[in-house]
Amino acid sequence: MEDLLKRVLSCEAFQQPQWSEPSQLHDAQAYLRDSASLIRVEDILVLRATLARVAAGEAMVIQSGDCAEDMDESTPDHVARKAAVLDILAGTFRLVTQQPVVRVGRIAGQFAKPRSNNNERIGDVELPVYRGDMVNGREAVCGHRQHDAQRLVRGYSAARDIMQHLGWKASASQEQLSGSPAWTNHEMLVLDYELPQLRQDEQGRVFLGSTHWPWIGERTRQLTGAHVTLLSEVLNPVACKVGPDITQDQLLSLCERLDAKREPGRLTLIARMGAQKVAERLPPLVEAVRQAGHKIIWLSDPMHGNTIVAPCGNKTRMVQAITEEIAAFKHAVTSAGGVAAGLHLETTPDDVSECASDAAGLHQVASRYKSLCDPRLNPWQAITAVMAWKNQPSSTLASF
């Protein structure tokens, strides 16, 4: 494990916090290293077996949860409400697909976000941009926006509580599809949080102890970067977001790094193309990966490629664009011989107005906007998105 740590630390790492107090970082990392792993290696093996079934076309996947988690929402009530939405979406997806559904929450660690800019201007003041509760505060005050390493410990504590509320106290003894509890995943972004949580089992296998199923995003998928280097060597199943600008050669090289042994279900690719690009850009990528021998799970992230700005100035997403991308994604993957296995959604149990169900909704986006970062689907909109799986690419949605 020490060799892996050295390799990762020798690589360039993008989107990392600039901590204000190095001594606090040292203390936080020591705490994380000495803390109990949030997951067990036995659970990882169960999940990998389950995802092998998904890669074979025998089951589907629903991933849903906050864009950026609120660390204060680690109470039993908050967790139960989020899990309930995931259960509803999984049940709906099972009705639509007539297949078992693996439930996965964007939860218990989705506390950090990559950002396009390091700073933002609020009024006459330029401040560090908010990067998630694990890094800095949301309040538009300089002191709150400093990168605070003590938040790493708070993040671990919140994640631990959430895992317990989800039901991860008992051991996993069989493949879990629609059973409880839900699996957890988050973007593996802040290496000062992730690296101290590397663990090694009795057989010498290294696994990430912070989540069951880590993913990396468009901004951290550099082939020789620290994030890819780390994910390439952990026992966990791994995932990577794939946008419209990736080339076939880049994707094949990425798959070779993350799935060198070509193990079914080891690697999931989450397509975030945008409704206007998915039909053109995705099929050649799916075909290239299939011909290279990778048994990939393909998921659709229909959110990030369809972000626009509402008249009020808030970021939003049109539900119609989301449903159109879902239908086009399914057709694109299946027509190219891949396994279109499910959805990766940003959702909330709250009745928010962050995404617009129709043109009139664009003018109401700000009325109930609670997201810490990007716009999420409310429960009714999320059900609409799941139902779009049965649509043909040209279908239109029913408005809520």
UniProtKB/Swiss-Prot annotation:
What's its EC?
2.5.1.54
Q: Which GO terms describe its molecular function?
A: 3-deoxy-7-phosphoheptulonate synthase activity
Determine the domain of life of the protein's source: Bacteria
Top class in the EC scheme: transferase
- Record's keyword terms, sorted: Antibiotic biosynthesis, Transferase, Virulence
Keyword Transferase listed: yes
Pathway listed for it is: Antibiotic biosynthesis; phenazine biosynthesis
GO biological process terms held by the UniProt record: aromatic amino acid family biosynthetic process; phenazine biosynthetic process
Return the Pfam families for the record: DAHP_synth_2
The record's annotation in InterPro entries points to: Aldolase_TIM (IPR013785), DAHP_synth_2 (IPR002480)
> Which reaction(s) does the protein catalyse, per the Swiss-Prot or TrEMBL entry?
D-erythrose 4-phosphate + phosphoenolpyruvate + H2O = 7-phospho-2-dehydro-3-deoxy-D-arabino-heptonate + phosphate
What's this protein's family per the entry? Belongs to the class-II DAHP synthase family.
The entry's protein name is Probable phospho-2-dehydro-3-deoxyheptonate aldolase
Look up and give the organism this protein is from. Pseudomonas chlororaphis (Pseudomonas aureofaciens)
